[in-house]
């Protein structure tokens, strides 16, 4: 178990690195609403939803998951997804962490297991509720997140692959990398954070696949962003995350299809393993890589 002192230090460090939370939800043409009756919520995760005025028929859904020290309303204010939803007509779900530090549980057995009763279970139930409530297209559900939210994005893609068509990961770690052998909820794993959990694509794939035993259906395509000078979640985590999804999709991690310099912008390098996996490494960028909303829209198929 982390001591209270260490937890305080970790929270203080993260607070200094992440965006401040807006005092009030930004005014947009739609409105952010809190939903409390979306179904089973075993860990008390908050649900906020943005439904655009320009709601499409059979709309898509984007689940946007905040960083440590964040909240659902904070990520609504500090990201582009609500504005983009007015352009493309999709619904945005903003989960909100139930923990005092604002991080996500990506460490307990419950959250790392399909229908295990952890944070991932609560977020999955938000998705199924929204599909039912708004007649959303179940084939157009996407997940994205920054830092701790990026970690949870990988966890959601591993634990509920049937729910998502694609994901974008902004400065996270592999699904299962923060696993706590003491089953700690919302635990910090310095070994993983510092890039010292290194293994093979096959092993990483087995970790992800074990989160939903027996599942053999489709899995979301993944786009992984990370910065070269990240000192919170070290750059090695980029390579390990790409290994994991290369292993899941059966790509040869050591032989990508192509590498494109200065893509999608100067000092960013995009590596493509196949239709289902891209890695984007940002030279000179720390924690976290800024959200590339337009590129997300392309990856999700809205643009």
From Swiss-Prot:
Pathway: Glycan degradation; xylan degradation. It is found in: Secreted. Keywords: Carbohydrate metabolism, Cellulose degradation, Glycoprotein, Hydrolase, Polysaccharide degradation, Secreted, Serine esterase, Signal. It catalyses: Deacetylation of xylans and xylo-oligosaccharides. GO terms for biological process: cellulose catabolic process; xylan catabolic process. Its EC number is 3.1.1.72. The active site is at residue 147. It is an enzyme of class 3 (hydrolase). Belongs to the carbohydrate esterase 1 (CE1) family. AxeA subfamily. This is Probable acetylxylan esterase A.
């Amino acid at each position: 178990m982390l001591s209270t002192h260490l937890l305080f230090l970790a929270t203080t460090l993260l607070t200094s690195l992440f965006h401040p939370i807006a005092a009030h939800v930004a005014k947009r043409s739609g409105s952010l609403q809190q939903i409390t009756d979306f179904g089973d919520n075993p860990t008390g995760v908050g649900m906020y939803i943005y439904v655009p005025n320009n709601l499409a028929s059979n709309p898509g859904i984007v689940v946007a998951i905040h960083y440590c020290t964040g909240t659902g309303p904070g990520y609504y204010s500090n990201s582009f997804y609500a504005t983009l939803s007015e352009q493309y007509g999709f619904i945005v779900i903003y989960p909100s962490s139930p923990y005092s530090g604002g991080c996500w549980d990506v460490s307990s057995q419950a959250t790392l297991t399909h229908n295990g009763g952890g944070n991932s279970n609560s977020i999955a139930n938000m998705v199924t509720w929204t599909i039912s409530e708004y007649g959303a297209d179940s084939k157009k559900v996407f997940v994205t997140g920054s830092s701790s939210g990026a970690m949870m994005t990988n966890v959601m893609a591993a634990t509920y692959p049937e729910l998502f068509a694609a994901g974008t990961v902004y400065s996270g770690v592999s699904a299962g990398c923060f696993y706590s052998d003491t089953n700690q909820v919302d635990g910090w794993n310095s070994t993983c954070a510092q890039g010292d959990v290194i293994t093979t694509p096959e092993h990483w794939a087995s970790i992800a696949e074990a989160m939903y035993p027996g599942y053999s259906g489709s899995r979301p395509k993944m786009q992984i962003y990370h910065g070269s000078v990240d000192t919170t979640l070290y750059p090695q985590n980029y390579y390990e995350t790409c290994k994991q999804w290369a292993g899941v999709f059966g790509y040869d991690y050591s032989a990508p299809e192509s590498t494109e310099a200065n893509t999608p912008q100067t000092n960013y390098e995009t590596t493509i393993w196949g239709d289902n996996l891209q890695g984007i490494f940002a030279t000179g960028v720390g924690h976290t890589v800024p959200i590339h909303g337009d590129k997300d829209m392309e990856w999700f198929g809205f643009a």
